[in-house]
């Protein structure tokens, strides 16, 4: 039985195979239901985001929303990003943003041109970014060139500051649409600008991503999964972990475990006054995580409504999918407490706003630099 840094003991069967994917009941958080006799507080600052460290409580717990700057750090400018005027894009589609202490700059990996490039922009302050021209394709800031006919979908780039292998310092996942069918691949890089030969992963859906659990030294893949219990299509997440990123990426179906979904407490409205289809519940569109102080922080991307869940409806109506980002917290890296069901980052339906509709968490979630 593995004992974690905080005194929690994991069961012999790990990851658990008992998460309910057949209903909308709340998912369990075992370490809150049966707390260890002694909670260890030696790792990281202790965050009172749940009741794990609280013996008695007569206070009101209050969560706060993020305050957004309406001005984007990137907007489509280059021919690749403008994509001949068809769905221009210069934004993370997960991808990643990191402060790299090796060269003292912030690196933003982003989706450049719809279903096209994965590009790199750099910044000295994390707010003002310039495109880093690279030699992978002359005149562009692509970090790699896809095969002819291959179109990128979701992507994730991670800076691994704990690796003992310098050539694997940057790790990347891509989901591709190809003439032969969809495929997902991983690759590694020493400099985050030139990646080596890829390895094909196990089966997964688009918007799959990965993260590093620093408390258990595990690489975890957040795998898009359809729920079997509903008469409509509903999204959830499955979980797969490994010790070595490249060697462990080719998982078999029986190695993954059902992980997370929405439940009866998830809100069926988002912006005040905006009500979506109440006949069908919200869906878990994505889940990205990062180790933060003494917990794993997760951002649950929850899609609201039903009609907008279909791409054709969105395209015909000119309205993007409505996705808000909700915060969750885990002390074992698998089970999440979500006491607050209001969005941490709320999208808007306001036409012309950069925060309209289709919000995605960036790989790494939050930046930690020498100053803040």
Regions found by a protein language model. Give the residues of each.
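Extended C-terminal regions of large enzymes
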Residues: 360-362, 369
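Beta-rich carbohydrate-recognition and catalytic domains
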Residues: 1-285, 290-356, 370-372
């Amino acid at each position: 039985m593995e004992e974690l840094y905080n005194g929690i003991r994991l069961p012999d069967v790990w990851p658990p195979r008992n998460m309910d994917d057949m209903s909308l009941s709340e998912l369990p958080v075992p370490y809150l239901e049966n707390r260890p006799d002694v909670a260890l507080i030696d790792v990281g600052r202790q965050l009172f985001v749940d009741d794990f460290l609280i013996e008695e409580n007569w206070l009101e717990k209050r969560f706060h929303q993020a305050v957004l700057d309406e001005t984007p750090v990137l907007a489509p400018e280059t021919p690749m990003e403008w994509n001949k005027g068809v769905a221009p894009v210069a934004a993370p589609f997960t991808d990643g943003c990191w402060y790299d202490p090796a060269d003292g700059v912030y690196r933003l990996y982003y989706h450049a041109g719809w279903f096209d490039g994965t590009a790199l922009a750099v910044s000295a302050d994390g707010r003002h970014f310039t495109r880093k021209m690279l030699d992978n394709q002359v005149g562009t800031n692509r970090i790699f060139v896809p095969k002819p006919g291959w179109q990128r979908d979701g992507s994730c780039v991670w800076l691994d500051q704990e690796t003992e292998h310098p050539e694997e310092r940057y790790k990347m996942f891509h989901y591709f649409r190809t003439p032969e069918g969809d495929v997902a691949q991983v690759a590694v890089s020493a400099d985050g600008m030139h990646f080596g030969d890829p390895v094909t992963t196990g089966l997964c859906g688009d918007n799959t991503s990965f993260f590093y659990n620093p408390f258990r030294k595990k690489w975890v893949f957040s795998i898009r999964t359809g729920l079997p219990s509903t008469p409509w299509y509903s999204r959830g997440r499955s979980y797969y972990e490994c010790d070595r990123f490249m060697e462990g990426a080719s998982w078999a179906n029986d190695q993954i475990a059902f992980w997370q979904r929405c439940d009866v407490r998830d809100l069926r409205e988002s912006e005040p006054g905006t009500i979506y289809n109440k006949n069908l519940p919200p869906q878990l569109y994505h889940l990205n995580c990062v180790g933060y102080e003494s917990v794993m922080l997760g951002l649950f991307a929850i899609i609201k409504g039903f009609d907008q869940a279909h791409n054709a409806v969105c395209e015909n109506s000119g309205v993007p999918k409505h996705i808000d980002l909700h915060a969750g917290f885990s002390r074992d890296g698998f089970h999440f407490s979500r006491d607050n069901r209001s969005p941490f980052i709320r999208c808007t339906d306001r036409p012309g706003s950069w925060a309209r509709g289709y919000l995605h968490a960036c790989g790494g979630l939050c930046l930690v630099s020498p100053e803040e």
